[in-house]
């Protein structure tokens, strides 16, 4: 039980690192939540701080989810504080990743007012199901490039993830996943565990729900478009 709690706490604290708020303070001396959309996430960092800072913020937010879901769980498996949790490891990684997402959304370091958690959730899934997530990222980038609406890309990507897992698992009969070997020593497991399918479906519904204001603005034509212009 102690090991499980330690995983949750460490993952939450990693997720709580307020990347965009720190970047706003360092680069412009501002609280990014008082500008743009008012959100402490990567998309608002692109709007307020420019594409370079926005890219760095987004990559760090993604890394928070990956680190929480894979290395943190792996570390405590190798160095448990008592018995290691007797549960499906993919489920444990998902729980740890979600602790990081909760930390990102309700960061203890910034008055529990953070971002929406999309990048951190994506990072968690990149660590657990990298091949499926590469496909999802491709769909996201294509949707954003064509529409210039990040919200459209986020919603379509959320819907695509459980569909891709289901198609690869049941249509192509790939079982619980595949292992990839790099440089003879580095192994990456691309999971297709059924926990991912259930989780992906829940996340898709949750992301559509959290983007309901964006959906209303899309239909009314008032949603902010992403500018690809050069801004430092």
From Swiss-Prot:
Domain of life (superkingdom): Bacteria
InterPro entries: G3P_acylTferase_PlsY
Cellular component aspect of the GO annotation: plasma membrane
Annotated keywords: Cell inner membrane, Cell membrane, Lipid biosynthesis, Lipid metabolism, Membrane, Phospholipid biosynthesis, Phospholipid metabolism, Transferase, Transmembrane, Transmembrane helix
UniProt GO molecular function: acyl-phosphate glycerol-3-phosphate acyltransferase activity
GO biological process: phospholipid biosynthetic process
Membrane-spanning intervals of the chain: 4-24, 56-76, 90-110, 124-144, 152-172, 191-211
Location relative to the cell: Cell inner membrane
Topology of this chain in the membrane: Multi-pass membrane protein
EC number from the UniProt entry: 2.3.1.275
NCBIfam families recorded: glycerol-3-phosphate 1-O-acyltransferase PlsY (TIGR00023)
Function: Catalyzes the transfer of an acyl group from acyl-phosphate (acyl-PO(4)) to glycerol-3-phosphate (G3P) to form lysophosphatidic acid (LPA). This enzyme utilizes acyl-phosphate as fatty acyl donor, but not acyl-CoA or acyl-ACP.
Subunit structure of this chain's protein: Probably interacts with PlsX.
Homology family: Belongs to the PlsY family.
Record-given protein name: Glycerol-3-phosphate acyltransferase
Origin species: Chlorobaculum tepidum (strain ATCC 49652 / DSM 12025 / NBRC 103806 / TLS)
